[in-house]
């Protein structure tokens, strides 16, 4: 059975405690264990000791869809530093996710990556917390293999707990459809994706042009992008738009 959503609070709390007991071996570090299914990436699980406000804003705005660190991780199998060229090339100084990171001083770190056979990507993202950057970099470099193994064992443990929980509740399993867009937003984004103008969309749907712009604005905000053109492209690339 493929598990797309890791949203059991009890299991996630167990995993958080497991990580925290082991991560402290490497210093006073901030970490974020992020898991998402690459085919249905809209609802990642984030288990972290980062500030709760950061986690809430990151998830609410679906920043994992535009985060250069996560975008880089999709193409990686080895650990990498956040100042690696592969990350820098994806950075945008106007990116909402980096504005949020600077606000909480989450700017210097490393990411460890794992891709499993159920199409999930797991990352263990570590930043230096109260450690100075030089000693932090040295400590991570020395312990790279151990931290990568921590990610592997953690992810295997998490999959095992969810599989066990799924087996217990197999008869009660129901698929809950989770959409990032409202039905109206999806309609408008669909017509925009096939080349219709705001004026044409307003005629097709029998609504005002200003209403079309309002919903497009919501789509832009949800995806954390700069404009409608970028939102449409991202919606197409990630297959977020349902056909009408």
Swiss-Prot record:
GO MF annotation list: DNA binding
Organism: Yersinia enterocolitica
Family: Belongs to the autoinducer-regulated transcriptional regulatory protein family.
Domain HTH luxR-type: 174-239
Main function: Probable transcriptional activator. Binds to autoinducer molecules OHHL and HHL.
DNA-binding region: 198-217
PANTHER family documented for this protein: DNA-BINDING TRANSCRIPTIONAL ACTIVATOR DEVR_DOSR (PTHR44688:SF16)
Pfam families: Autoind_bind (PF03472), GerE (PF00196)
Lineage: Bacteria, Pseudomonadati, Pseudomonadota, Gammaproteobacteria, Enterobacterales
UniProt keyword annotation of Magnesium present: no
Alphabetical UniProt keywords: Activator, DNA-binding, Quorum sensing, Transcription, Transcription regulation
Name of the protein in its database record: Transcriptional activator protein YenR
Any GO BP annotation: quorum sensing
InterPro entries documented for this protein: Sig_transdc_resp-reg_C-effctor (IPR016032), TF_LuxR_autoind-bd_dom (IPR005143), TF_LuxR_autoind-bd_dom_sf (IPR036693), Tscrpt_reg_LuxR_C (IPR000792), WH-like_DNA-bd_sf (IPR036388)
């Amino acid at each position: 059975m493929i598990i797309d959503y890791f949203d059991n609070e009890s299991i996630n709390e167990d995993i958080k405690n497991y990580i925290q007991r082991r991560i402290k071996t490497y210093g006073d570090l901030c970490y974020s264990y992020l898991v998402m299914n690459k085919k249905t990436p809209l609802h990642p699980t984030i288990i972290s000791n980062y500030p709760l406000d950061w986690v809430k804003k990151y998830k609410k705005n679906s920043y994992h869809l535009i985060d250069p660190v996560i975008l880089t991780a999709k193409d990686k199998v080895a650990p990498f530093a956040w100042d690696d060229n592969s990350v820098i090339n994806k950075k945008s100084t106007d990116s909402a996710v980096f504005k949020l990171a600077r606000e909480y001083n989450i700017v210097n770190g490393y990411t460890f990556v794992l891709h499993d056979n159920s199409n999930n990507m797991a990352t263990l993202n570590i930043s230096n917390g109260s450690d100075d950057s030089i000693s932090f970099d040295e400590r991570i470099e020395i312990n790279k293999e151990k931290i990568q193994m921590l990610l592997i064992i953690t992810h295997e443990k998490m999959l095992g707990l969810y599989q066990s929980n799924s087996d217990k509740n197999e008869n009660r399993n129901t698929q809950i459809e989770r959409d990032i867009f409202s039905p109206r937003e999806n309609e408008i984004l669909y017509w925009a994706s096939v080349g219709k103008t705001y004026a044409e969309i307003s005629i097709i749907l029998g609504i005002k042009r200003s209403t079309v712009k309002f919903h497009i604005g919501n789509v832009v905000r949800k995806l954390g992008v700069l404009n409608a053109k970028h939102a449409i492209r991202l919606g197409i690339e990630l297959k977020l738009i349902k056909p009408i």
